Amino acid sequence: MARYDALELQVIDENGYEYIRAHEGVSIDDELLRFLRRTHTYELGWVKVEGDKYVRYDRIASVAIKRGLDDESGPGPSR
């Protein structure tokens, strides 16, 4: 069972969380820096999360690093 780290986003007016996996060859800490600085793939007003969903930056209430997520079950329900 593959485990991975991701950024966990809490979106305003939504139950649960959205997740962003670190890009290939990038640590989750560096991915968080890219997200906070809005560089690389985070330069636009929309952020791609797992699946084919996009979230607007101005709708994100918080971001945190979530470690050890399970590849088979995914992030799971709201925590």
Region locations from a protein language model:
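Short small/polar-residue motifs
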Residues: 6, 33-36, 58-62
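Intrinsically disordered, low-complexity segments enriched in small/polar residues
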Residues: 2, 15-17, 40, 52-55
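Short, mixed-charge low-complexity intrinsically disordered segments
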Residues: 42-79
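Acidic, low-complexity, intrinsically disordered interaction modules
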Residues: 22, 26-45, 49
